[in-house]
Amino acid sequence: MPKGEGKVVSQNKKANHDYFIEETYEAGLVLQGTEIKSIRAGKVNLKDSFAKIERGEVFLHNMHVSPYEQGNRYNHDPLRTRKLLLHRKQISKLIGATKEEGYSLVPLKLYLKNGFAKVLIGIGKGKKKYDKREDLKKKDAKREIERAFRDRQKQF
């Protein structure tokens, strides 16, 4: 399966709005038992999450996984830091990329692949306000063109 395929559980739509994504990597997650059950139920939010490299390992911060309803006292902390599983070469590439000014690691989507939870992280460079406006203008123009084309097709 190519990168990003599988049952998508959660997407970080804000990431494509706030960053220019240059490269993506698929990473596994180190989870507890009740966390994977909540993820399979789709109770996860990637909106404010980010990845950080600490002591040569990659960690995912602020990913909210809701507590499992039947988890009682064995439930997990919803915002705990989770370790990402990547190859050493990939981690060294990420270290090199994030040392550059303005680059950061952003989780793009969380999905299930062959029963395992995977996260697609991207190396992103932050957009300026005028870049965001430009993207919105392009999107609106594209929508208008499609609408005009669709209306023209209806006439024939």
Swiss-Prot record:
GO BP terms: trans-translation
Molecular function GO terms recorded: RNA binding
SUPFAM superfamilies the UniProt entry points to: Small protein B (SmpB) (SSF74982)
Keyword match Oxidoreductase: no
GO cellular component: a single term: cytosol
Keywords: Cytoplasm, RNA-binding
Residue stretches in coiled coil: none
Protein name: SsrA-binding protein
Organism from which the protein derives: Bacillus pumilus (strain SAFR-032)
Subcellular location: Cytoplasm
Major location (coarse): cytoplasm
Similarity section: Belongs to the SmpB family.
Tree of life domain: Bacteria
Stored InterPro entries: SmpB, SsrA-bd_prot, SsrA-bd_prot_CS
Source taxonomy: Bacteria, Bacillati, Bacillota, Bacilli, Bacillales
